[in-house]
Amino acid sequence: MKRAVVVFSGGQDSTTCLVQALQQYDEVHCVTFDYGQRHRAEIDVARELALKLGARAHKVLDVTLLNELAVSSLTRDSIPVPDYEPEADGIPNTFVPGRNILFLTLAAIYAYQVKAEAVITGVCETDFSGYPDCRDEFVKALNHAVSLGMAKDIRFETPLMWIDKAETWALADYYGKLDLVRNETLTCYNGIKGDGCGHCAACNLRANGLNHYLADKPTVMAAIKQKTGLK
Protein backbone atom coordinates (compact mmCIF):
# COMPACT_ATOMS: atom_id res chain seq x y z
CA MET A 1 0.00 0.00 0.00
CA LYS A 2 1.32 3.42 -0.98
CA ARG A 3 1.06 5.99 1.82
CA ALA A 4 1.85 9.70 1.97
CA VAL A 5 1.75 12.48 4.55
CA VAL A 6 0.70 15.97 3.47
CA VAL A 7 1.90 19.02 5.40
CA PHE A 8 -1.50 20.66 5.51
CA SER A 9 -2.41 24.24 6.39
CA GLY A 10 -5.79 24.41 4.69
CA GLY A 11 -4.52 26.98 2.19
CA GLN A 12 -4.63 26.90 -1.61
CA ASP A 13 -1.30 25.18 -2.12
CA SER A 14 -1.51 22.44 0.49
CA THR A 15 -5.14 21.71 -0.39
CA THR A 16 -4.20 21.30 -4.05
CA CYS A 17 -1.41 18.96 -2.95
CA LEU A 18 -3.89 16.95 -0.88
CA VAL A 19 -6.35 16.70 -3.77
CA GLN A 20 -3.60 15.35 -6.02
CA ALA A 21 -2.15 13.02 -3.38
CA LEU A 22 -5.55 11.39 -2.87
CA GLN A 23 -5.44 10.38 -6.53
CA GLN A 24 -1.87 9.10 -6.39
CA TYR A 25 -1.69 7.26 -3.06
CA ASP A 26 -3.77 4.55 -1.44
CA GLU A 27 -3.69 6.21 1.97
CA VAL A 28 -3.08 9.88 2.72
CA HIS A 29 -2.51 11.40 6.15
CA CYS A 30 -2.57 15.13 6.89
CA VAL A 31 -0.43 16.88 9.49
CA THR A 32 -1.30 20.42 10.59
CA PHE A 33 0.77 22.47 13.01
CA ASP A 34 -0.48 24.69 15.82
CA TYR A 35 2.35 27.15 16.36
CA GLY A 36 0.27 29.89 17.95
CA GLN A 37 -0.23 31.49 14.57
CA ARG A 38 -1.99 34.81 14.33
CA HIS A 39 -5.09 33.33 12.74
CA ARG A 40 -6.11 30.06 14.35
CA ALA A 41 -8.97 29.73 11.86
CA GLU A 42 -6.60 27.97 9.48
CA ILE A 43 -6.49 24.97 11.84
CA ASP A 44 -10.28 24.70 11.75
CA VAL A 45 -10.27 25.04 7.96
CA ALA A 46 -7.63 22.31 7.70
CA ARG A 47 -9.74 20.00 9.88
CA GLU A 48 -12.83 20.59 7.77
CA LEU A 49 -11.05 20.05 4.46
CA ALA A 50 -9.14 16.95 5.54
CA LEU A 51 -12.42 15.35 6.59
CA LYS A 52 -14.34 16.52 3.53
CA LEU A 53 -11.72 15.39 1.03
CA GLY A 54 -11.23 11.99 2.63
CA ALA A 55 -7.81 11.94 4.29
CA ARG A 56 -7.16 8.70 6.18
CA ALA A 57 -6.18 10.66 9.29
CA HIS A 58 -5.58 14.27 10.30
CA LYS A 59 -3.13 15.06 13.07
CA VAL A 60 -2.79 18.52 14.62
CA LEU A 61 0.58 18.83 16.34
CA ASP A 62 1.31 21.36 19.08
CA VAL A 63 4.49 23.25 18.23
CA THR A 64 3.72 26.46 20.13
CA LEU A 65 7.36 26.64 21.19
CA LEU A 66 8.00 27.98 17.68
CA ASN A 67 5.91 31.02 18.57
CA GLU A 68 8.25 31.83 21.45
CA LEU A 69 11.34 31.59 19.27
CA ALA A 70 10.22 33.01 15.91
CA VAL A 71 9.20 36.66 15.73
CA SER A 72 7.00 37.36 12.70
CA SER A 73 3.82 39.20 11.78
CA LEU A 74 2.20 35.75 11.63
CA THR A 75 3.11 35.06 15.27
CA ARG A 76 2.76 38.53 16.83
CA ASP A 77 -0.41 40.63 16.83
CA SER A 78 1.76 43.68 17.52
CA ILE A 79 3.48 43.38 14.12
CA PRO A 80 1.17 44.46 11.28
CA VAL A 81 0.82 42.30 8.18
CA PRO A 82 2.12 44.44 5.29
CA ASP A 83 0.13 45.16 2.16
CA TYR A 84 1.54 43.72 -1.05
CA GLU A 85 4.48 45.74 -2.42
CA PRO A 86 5.66 44.48 -5.83
CA GLU A 87 9.06 46.17 -5.55
CA ALA A 88 9.80 45.11 -1.96
CA ASP A 89 13.24 43.61 -1.37
CA GLY A 90 14.46 41.20 1.28
CA ILE A 91 12.63 38.68 3.40
CA PRO A 92 9.13 39.87 4.39
CA ASN A 93 8.04 40.08 8.03
CA THR A 94 5.56 37.26 7.38
CA PHE A 95 8.49 34.82 7.29
CA VAL A 96 8.53 32.50 10.31
CA PRO A 97 12.17 31.42 10.80
CA GLY A 98 12.60 27.67 11.03
CA ARG A 99 8.96 26.87 10.30
CA ASN A 100 9.47 24.55 7.35
CA ILE A 101 12.54 22.99 8.95
CA LEU A 102 10.39 21.99 11.91
CA PHE A 103 7.26 21.10 9.93
CA LEU A 104 9.02 18.83 7.45
CA THR A 105 11.07 17.12 10.14
CA LEU A 106 8.04 16.39 12.32
CA ALA A 107 6.01 15.28 9.31
CA ALA A 108 8.82 12.86 8.45
CA ILE A 109 8.75 11.44 11.99
CA TYR A 110 5.00 10.94 11.61
CA ALA A 111 5.55 9.35 8.19
CA TYR A 112 8.04 6.95 9.75
CA GLN A 113 5.44 5.82 12.28
CA VAL A 114 2.63 5.26 9.76
CA LYS A 115 5.01 3.67 7.22
CA ALA A 116 4.48 6.38 4.62
CA GLU A 117 6.99 6.65 1.79
CA ALA A 118 6.51 10.35 1.08
CA VAL A 119 6.01 13.70 2.78
CA ILE A 120 4.28 16.19 0.48
CA THR A 121 4.60 19.95 0.89
CA GLY A 122 3.18 22.78 -1.21
CA VAL A 123 6.25 25.01 -1.24
CA CYS A 124 7.01 26.75 -4.52
CA GLU A 125 10.00 28.61 -5.91
CA THR A 126 8.38 29.94 -9.10
CA ASP A 127 6.28 32.74 -7.62
CA PHE A 128 6.62 32.90 -3.88
CA SER A 129 6.95 35.42 -1.07
CA GLY A 130 10.73 35.31 -0.75
CA TYR A 131 10.91 32.70 2.00
CA PRO A 132 14.29 30.89 2.01
CA ASP A 133 12.69 27.68 3.29
CA CYS A 134 10.54 27.35 0.16
CA ARG A 135 13.55 26.80 -2.09
CA ASP A 136 14.23 23.52 -3.83
CA GLU A 137 17.81 23.34 -2.56
CA PHE A 138 16.60 23.66 1.03
CA VAL A 139 14.00 20.91 0.71
CA LYS A 140 16.47 18.54 -0.93
CA ALA A 141 19.14 19.24 1.70
CA LEU A 142 16.73 18.64 4.59
CA ASN A 143 15.36 15.52 2.91
CA HIS A 144 18.87 14.11 2.69
CA ALA A 145 19.59 14.90 6.36
CA VAL A 146 16.30 13.42 7.58
CA SER A 147 16.75 10.24 5.56
CA LEU A 148 20.25 9.81 6.98
CA GLY A 149 19.08 10.49 10.52
CA MET A 150 16.29 7.93 10.31
CA ALA A 151 18.13 5.39 8.17
CA LYS A 152 15.00 5.35 6.04
CA ASP A 153 14.28 6.74 2.60
CA ILE A 154 11.34 9.06 3.23
CA ARG A 155 10.88 11.14 0.09
CA PHE A 156 9.99 14.85 0.29
CA GLU A 157 7.73 15.67 -2.65
CA THR A 158 7.17 19.24 -3.87
CA PRO A 159 4.59 18.99 -6.68
CA LEU A 160 4.19 22.78 -6.93
CA MET A 161 7.88 23.71 -6.83
CA TRP A 162 8.25 24.64 -10.50
CA ILE A 163 4.73 25.73 -11.40
CA ASP A 164 3.23 29.18 -10.98
CA LYS A 165 0.00 30.18 -9.26
CA ALA A 166 -2.04 30.08 -12.48
CA GLU A 167 -0.87 26.52 -13.04
CA THR A 168 -1.68 25.65 -9.42
CA TRP A 169 -5.27 26.76 -10.09
CA ALA A 170 -5.24 24.66 -13.26
CA LEU A 171 -4.10 21.64 -11.24
CA ALA A 172 -7.02 22.06 -8.84
CA ASP A 173 -9.37 22.42 -11.80
CA TYR A 174 -7.94 19.29 -13.44
CA TYR A 175 -9.08 17.31 -10.42
CA GLY A 176 -12.47 19.06 -10.36
CA LYS A 177 -11.78 21.04 -7.19
CA LEU A 178 -11.29 24.62 -8.37
CA ASP A 179 -14.43 25.93 -6.66
CA LEU A 180 -13.59 24.14 -3.42
CA VAL A 181 -10.06 25.54 -3.40
CA ARG A 182 -11.31 29.02 -4.22
CA ASN A 183 -14.13 29.17 -1.69
CA GLU A 184 -13.15 26.89 1.18
CA THR A 185 -9.40 27.33 1.68
CA LEU A 186 -7.66 29.99 3.77
CA THR A 187 -4.52 31.53 2.30
CA CYS A 188 -4.91 35.16 3.42
CA TYR A 189 -2.37 36.53 5.91
CA ASN A 190 -5.25 38.43 7.54
CA GLY A 191 -7.19 35.24 8.17
CA ILE A 192 -10.05 35.71 5.70
CA LYS A 193 -11.31 32.55 4.02
CA GLY A 194 -11.89 32.26 0.27
CA ASP A 195 -10.73 35.22 -1.80
CA GLY A 196 -9.32 36.84 1.36
CA CYS A 197 -8.59 40.47 2.14
CA GLY A 198 -7.35 41.24 -1.36
CA HIS A 199 -4.37 43.34 -0.36
CA CYS A 200 -1.79 41.17 1.44
CA ALA A 201 0.98 39.42 -0.52
CA ALA A 202 -0.68 36.00 -0.25
CA CYS A 203 -3.98 37.31 -1.61
CA ASN A 204 -2.21 39.16 -4.41
CA LEU A 205 -0.37 36.05 -5.61
CA ARG A 206 -3.52 33.97 -5.36
CA ALA A 207 -5.77 36.48 -7.17
CA ASN A 208 -3.28 37.20 -9.96
CA GLY A 209 -2.85 33.49 -10.56
CA LEU A 210 -6.60 32.89 -10.67
CA ASN A 211 -7.20 35.80 -13.04
CA HIS A 212 -4.44 34.55 -15.34
CA TYR A 213 -5.88 31.05 -15.36
CA LEU A 214 -9.47 32.15 -15.95
CA ALA A 215 -8.37 34.47 -18.78
CA ASP A 216 -6.55 31.71 -20.68
CA LYS A 217 -7.62 28.29 -19.41
CA PRO A 218 -6.60 26.21 -22.44
CA THR A 219 -3.03 27.52 -22.52
CA VAL A 220 -2.45 27.24 -18.77
CA MET A 221 -4.02 23.77 -18.60
CA ALA A 222 -1.82 22.62 -21.48
CA ALA A 223 1.23 23.97 -19.66
CA ILE A 224 0.44 22.15 -16.41
CA LYS A 225 -0.18 18.91 -18.26
CA GLN A 226 3.14 19.21 -20.06
CA LYS A 227 5.04 19.97 -16.84
CA THR A 228 3.43 17.23 -14.77
CA GLY A 229 2.75 14.52 -17.33
CA LEU A 230 -1.00 14.58 -16.69
CA LYS A 231 -3.17 13.35 -19.55
UniProtKB/Swiss-Prot annotation:
It catalyses: 7-carboxy-7-deazaguanine + NH4(+) + ATP = 7-cyano-7-deazaguanine + ADP + phosphate + H2O + H(+). GO terms for biological process: queuosine biosynthetic process. Its cofactor is Zn(2+). Keywords: ATP-binding, Ligase, Metal-binding, Nucleotide-binding, Queuosine biosynthesis, Zinc. Binds 1 zinc ion per subunit. It comes from the Bacteria. One of its GO terms (molecular function) is ATP binding. Its EC number is 6.3.4.20. Transmembrane segments: none annotated. InterPro entries: QueC, Rossmann-like_a/b/a_fold. The keyword Ligase applies. CDD domains: QueC-like (cd01995). ATP binds at residues 8-18. Pathway: Purine metabolism; 7-cyano-7-deazaguanine biosynthesis. It holds the Pfam family QueC. Zn(2+) binds at residues 188, 197, 200, 203. Catalyzes the ATP-dependent conversion of 7-carboxy-7-deazaguanine (CDG) to 7-cyano-7-deazaguanine (preQ(0)). Belongs to the QueC family. NCBIfam families: 7-cyano-7-deazaguanine synthase QueC, PRK11106.1. This is 7-cyano-7-deazaguanine synthase. It comes from Escherichia coli O127:H6 (strain E2348/69 / EPEC).
